[in-house]
Amino acid sequence: MRTKINALLAILLIFVTTVSCDNYLDLRPQDGIVREEFWKTKEDIQAAVIGMYSSLLKSPPGVTVPTGGTDYTMPEYLFMFGEIRGDMVSPGTYVTTDQRDITTSNILSSNDITSWHVFYRVINYCNTIIDLAPAVIDKDPTLTQKQLNNYLSEALAVRAYLYFTLARTFKDVPLKLTATLSDKDNFQLPTSTQSDVLAQVAKDLALAEGYAVTSYGNTASDKGRITVYTINTMQTDVYLWMEKYPEALAAATKVTESGKFSLIQASSNWFTRVFAQGNSSEGIFELQYTTANLNPFYDMLFQRPEFTAAPNVFEGVFGIDYVNSANQDIRSDRCSLVAGTNEIYKFTGLNTDERKALSECDTHWFVYRYSDVLLLKAEALAELGRGAEAVPIIEEIRAKRNAINATSQSVDPANKAQVIDYILAERAREFAFEGKRWFDVLRNAKRNNYERLDILLNMAVTNAPADQQQSILAKLRDPNSHYLPINVYDLYTNKALVQNPFYK
């Protein structure tokens, strides 16, 4: 027990010393006592990996963003990056000016939301594990190569996911693959192209796949830590962005044929099982909040709401059965949102009647669920001209969710655009407010040299103020505007960076 406590204290010390530097990547060298006393046993590696996951939930004590702005948690950034430029959220009573500006595509490089420091902070934790853990095998005879590889797979996959998110959000970003271990490290790193970043992500995931476990022996770890199925799901997502459809289909099939996951039939306790409790048979990778470490959304979405569901979501996305009001999509009222108030309910609800108390708001952040890989698989099939195989996947999910007839679409399986539009509509229902909407539409809009720019433009003006719609459309016709600018602080502290041309 003393060894474990010492290891956990050591990793907390690493957190404090690693993130207090002023350079643009928010990294600090591992010189001195921390590095000398750590990285000696497999327990040290385990503590570092636990710390890596903990940093995905919230920042270590005493750590702030160097820009002086709001120190959002990773899930808050993931929510904002994936939702507030889309068509399913609206500004709430307590929305900030910076948040509102992003919803209307009025984005400046000084915008608080464009900070990437929390991402690079965790990336450095991953890099530190990847660089320093291998040497422990020569110091601890109880550490096996298989155990080491398992830990490395987790760090590689988390790093890959973070870079994947950055590439989808900012397009071209600095690609740092080694830990910051010395003051002599070069902090003036230029950006790498989006294609190069995605290629590195795919490379990391391929390596991680060979190292990963299929199970840790308990449900919480299987859902809260990286497994081979998490990696396969990430690969599916990444390959779709890279327009490598056979590879995406192959990765998705590894998950769907594993027998490890299943959809749960709609019932009175479906919401509680899947979301309020989490770690259900539908979960693939969930960030594990607990009552001792609450999620940030009780304040952000309920007590002082910065965002609400857009007015069109309840009827326009989920539909209403005007003949039988009891006939309702299980994902609709008192799951994704509260009808009438448009409160976003998914991360604060206990069941379909009762909201969690603040002290109980431990709903997870859902990085990937089984329905995600199913619909990504359907997307790959559609792009491969196999729409007849894609449509039944959509219908299977709709049946499990009790989707109503009003949202059903009659599509020609041979018409790729129709099938893709049906998939996007179903993804909107299935992943409402889970940080996916903007990325889903952008991924499909940009294919074949923006052949489907129309779906992005239509989405962008759905809830836009009438007097701003033409301005928004004019901006979004430039593909560079689909990505956020590099924050002005980072441009000032790293002269090697070059701003996105749209924001110059």
Regions found by a protein language model. Give the residues of each.
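Long, intrinsically disordered, low-complexity segments
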Residues: 20-22, 39, 77-79, 119-120, ...
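Flexible, polar/acidic helix-loop-strand segments at domain edges
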Residues: 90, 94-103, 317-370, 376
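Acidic, glycine-rich segments characteristic of secretory precursors and extracytoplasmic regions
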Residues: 2, 21-79, 195, 494-504
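Conserved, well-structured interaction surfaces
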Residues: 46, 54-60, 89-170, 195-196, ...
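Extended ligand-binding clefts on enzyme/binding-domain cores
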Residues: 58-60, 257-346, 419, 431
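Short, surface-exposed recognition loops and adjoining beta-strand edges that mediate ligand/DNA contacts
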Residues: 36, 63-91, 176-178, 185, ...
